[in-house]
Amino acid sequence: MAVPARTCGASRPGPARTARPWPGCGPHPGPGTRRPTSGPPRPLWLLLPLLPLLAAPGASAYSFPQQHTMQHWARRLEQEVDGVMRIFGGVQQLREIYKDNRNLFEVQENEPQKLVEKVAGDIESLLDRKVQALKRLADAAENFQKAHRWQDNIKEEDIVYYDAKADAELDDPESEDVERGSKASTLRLDFIEDPNFKNKVNYSYAAVQIPTDIYKGSTVILNELNWTEALENVFMENRRQDPTLLWQVFGSATGVTRYYPATPWRAPKKIDLYDVRRRPWYIQGASSPKDMVIIVDVSGSVSGLTLKLMKTSVCEMLDTLSDDDYVNVASFNEKAQPVSCFTHLVQANVRNKKVFKEAVQGMVAKGTTGYKAGFEYAFDQLQNSNITRANCNKMIMMFTDGGEDRVQDVFEKYNWPNRTVRVFTFSVGQHNYDVTPLQWMACANKGYYFEIPSIGAIRINTQEYLDVLGRPMVLAGKEAKQVQWTNVYEDALGLGLVVTGTLPVFNLTQDGPGEKKNQLILGVMGIDVALNDIKRLTPNYTLGANGYVFAIDLNGYVLLHPNLKPQTTNFREPVTLDFLDAELEDENKEEIRRSMIDGNKGHKQIRTLVKSLDERYIDEVTRNYTWVPIRSTNYSLGLVLPPYSTFYLQANLSDQILQVKLPISKLKDFEFLLPSSFESEGHVFIAPREYCKDLNASDNNTEFLKNFIELMEKVTPDSKQCNNFLLHNLILDTGITQQLVERVWRDQDLNTYSLLAVFAATDGGITRVFPNKAAEDWTENPEPFNASFYRRSLDNHGYVFKPPHQDALLRPLELENDTVGILVSTAVELSLGRRTLRPAVVGVKLDLEAWAEKFKVLASNRTHQDQPQKCGPNSHCEMDCEVNNEDLLCVLIDDGGFLVLSNQNHQWDQVGRFFSEVDANLMLALYNNSFYTRKESYDYQAACAPQPPGNLGAAPRGVFVPTVADFLNLAWWTSAAAWSLFQQLLYGLIYHSWFQADPAEAEGSPETRESSCVMKQTQYYFGSVNASYNAIIDCGNCSRLFHAQRLTNTNLLFVVAEKPLCSQCEAGRLLQKETHSDGPEQCELVQRPRYRRGPHICFDYNATEDTSDCGRGASFPPSLGVLVSLQLLLLLGLPPRPQPQVLVHASRRL
């Protein structure tokens, strides 16, 4: 229906409104001038000249309510809520019940400093046991290898071992090893399920995993398998001394992984790309931190195919860097320039590497080769001392197709005679250039020369530079034998999130008497520690729902934190969540983080913002932070406590009860946990905690309660297999909440006050909902510590309203079944002497429809419940929320901006929505007037639905597709470029999953598997305005008056506004829901990097280093039979099988 045009001085349409000029009317804007469609609300005092008109004699019956009227309505609402909560909530009665049962519990104190020091000491002891096991393994490995005698004629059948991939290959009839019949040397094992490993294992053997692109029958690999077999006895002895050990792993520099206990490899659906040398823990243990500049030749001589190889090579090179490293990437021809927005070295973290990888794809070949420009740029980058960097190994990695210039003058100026910067050169592609200059550059600067003729050589040749960096470490001997602990990452064998202690293993052999000692690293020894094992050392339930322990490393990344919950993990990358991203960042937390990284002790009480568990709300709270370093590690431990969690209750079942040797099920209060009592005492949900070792967990609370009761039939109160603190507190709270039913709830008529349920939840893990039938619609988490209403009630004074949550699809609520309710809860504060604590939360569940009607009555001018106000034609009345709901909008909105109640019947099914989705203009006005403020943050642990592939029907990414004319051109087929392309096509088809998808696709196809992504979150919370406030939403003829006032002792805002009668003033909506984001602008973030410290040890130089071994190529000699068969397979459309390649260099002879 069209809206009638409005004119200045005219009354608003409709019979019920008083005649008055429209706010905002005045002289008509001149030609070419446009009145703004919306603007900030104006305070009502600006309209004082108009107020006489609002009540002019002879006007229509109703006017916009006065401020004192709306304040009166607000007081009535406050009194009604307070009255219901006093009668049914039972806060005071529950306090009395606790005091009446004072003999059944003790009040214990959390002493932050003692507590955090104890936990830090326990973690130190745990890790120290792993360190001792690591040292035994590393020493044994070095001795075994030193005693080993190299065998040139060793054969596969001479070596017996368990091939971890054998079972998967036997199940695959097309496997290369099945075809070659080489299983004679492979053991077949039986396995048993072990919950500690989340896997089936065999404790009598270790397993061996060899990368797909390494030929397991090569002499180097067979000798490696031969001498590492002796490690199995050391693995077993370590486990005998420490049964809690998890995976013990030796990652060899040849690519062989031997791990204990044996378990079948988790083979992916595509080609298995696992190579231990590319794992974060191996890279960290094999070398010291790096400052790396990658320079890429993009001159015109770099053909399309060669440039594609370079791009892929750079991306693979970036994957060998960790968060302790710094990097920049530049392209060069006549000039050098960075490929991205980064103008200096930046930390090689996941997000920065992503920027590089995307920027590298945009490189274009043109111009002429200018090595001098590229090297001068790289040396300038490394000499820049005004930025944060690793300050250890310095290196330049140059990718080129070849050239004649040796740029000796550049090296003389920047690097000689000390040669502090290593130069690694990479000849990329098939070409006829003289590679002598590239070899000379590498050899003259303590580096190495590599060849990458085709795609299959990329992985091996972009990681072997680590051998060179490991030389000073090997030559340093015992000084370099220091255990390092990694970032958090995802275990490849399914253990979940782990950290790994690493220790390098050195080659102690000498070529002969008086000869120089060997300077090759043999590999890295590693022992995993599951994060869950560390968490078990921290207090779980004595800190309360909002207290927690956290730990960070030298990068500020969290090792422990309740918000460390990655929804997906990238197999190839560590899980790096900064402490300031795990919480809402502020200056106080920056200071705490810096102090922890510096290894200091400290304590600080701060006011800070916290995000609710459901991520819909923000609360400003007080928190006490206490922190200490964990000795012998790079970690620091912190403890966070709210002031009300300084004390906690500990059940003290009397001697008489404990002397009863009958099962716990015979104790008095236990009967109130039985379902048979629910009808009279209300339904009980128990938190799914680890009360006893033999208790079977279940996501279904009814099933869990059943399991719990069955176990209690067998367990006595002092059983050693149970956690007495948890168990006794559960039974104590069962009895206390039952007394609340008996004293308060049972004798009250909930229907009188339109209540669907009353409830109580406790620190002890009990949630009691009354009456029993209300449990059918109870959707809150049975673990109070994981329930948003529980945690928010503890942090807020007064009554916390929680409307039903509506999902992002904006489906309306279903009101037909009369079970949609609004939770109102409050914490029970208990004072015992001078000790104050909050051991429980109580509340009610309001019937939405009934309370919406009640809301209209309370916000009306009725003088009696059943007597509406009367206004004659000559009398003046103010509009109210009941009689004038067609003209007046009245709502209650909570502190997050979500609709709680409305006087508009059509809005009842929108309760729980963000109010901007209900009335965008009004919500914007509230925000602009500081009733609400906004907090934006990023969730770096989100999971997003898979994006539809953008290259369906195309050739594998990075592969050049020749034209028909090329195929018909004989000269093209005989050229070196054609041969190079053919190799590229073959290896691209065989191994293209290296570049198409992440190896983690083992668990699902890319079409169905969620991927890690960044989501931008926006939450709203109450601003600085506490008083009653009147304003106008100025929008010309669509202007609206509104009034807003906070309700005392609640998290509600009472808003009264004129309803909009036209839509021409639609303003931009405030958004609250999560949105997909690229995160903050990385180019800006690197200009103000967060504080961090690198490892305190650095091995980048040793005067005895032998740099004569400085270069060789690695190409794959083609087999005519293989190539012909692969071509036939391609023509027939059959998928080719990868052929074994010897990717272990001769220098690896051990």
Curated annotation (Swiss-Prot):
Side of membrane Cytoplasmic, spans: 1135-1150
Signal sequence segment: 1-18
Residues spanned by motif MIDAS-like motif: 297-301
InterPro entries according to UniProt: Ca_channel_alpha-2/delta, VDCC_a2/dsu, VWA_N, VWF_A, vWFA_dom_sf
Annotated segments matching region Disordered: 1-41
Superkingdom of this protein's organism: Eukaryota
Residues listed as glycosylation sites in the UniProt record: N386, N418, N507, N540, N624, N861
Residue span(s) of domain Cache: 485-574
Alphabetical list of Gene3D superfamilies matching this protein: PAS domain (3.30.450.20), von Willebrand factor, type A domain (3.40.50.410)
Stored Pfam families: VGCC_alpha2, VWA, VWA_N
Compartment(s): Membrane
Keywords from the named record: Calcium, Calcium channel, Calcium transport, Disease variant, Disulfide bond, Epilepsy, Glycoprotein, Ion channel, Ion transport, Membrane, Metal-binding, Signal, Transmembrane, Transmembrane helix, Transport, Voltage-gated channel
Record field: transmembrane: 1114-1134
Effect recorded for L1053P: In CASVDD; uncertain significance
UniProt GO MF annotations: metal ion binding; voltage-gated calcium channel activity
Domain VWFA: 291-469
Any one GO BP annotation for this protein: neuromuscular junction development
Membrane topology: Single-pass type I membrane protein
Cysteine disulfide links: C443-C1098
Post-translational modification (record): May be proteolytically processed into subunits alpha-2-2 and delta-2 that are disulfide-linked. It is however unclear whether such cleavage really takes place in vivo and has a functional role.
Outcome after substituting P261L: In CASVDD; uncertain significance
Disease affiliated with this protein: Cerebellar atrophy with seizures and variable developmental delay: An autosomal recessive neurologic disorder characterized by cerebellar ataxia, atrophy of the cerebellar vermis, severe refractory seizures with early onset, and global developmental delay compatible with epileptic encephalopathy in most patients. Disease severity is variable and normal cognitive development has also been reported.
UniProt remark on domains: The MIDAS-like motif in the VWFA domain binds divalent metal cations and is required to promote trafficking of the alpha-1 (CACNA1) subunit to the plasma membrane by an integrin-like switch.
Family statement: Belongs to the calcium channel subunit alpha-2/delta family.
Note: Binds gabapentin, an antiepileptic drug.
Name used for this protein in its record: Voltage-dependent calcium channel subunit alpha-2/delta-2
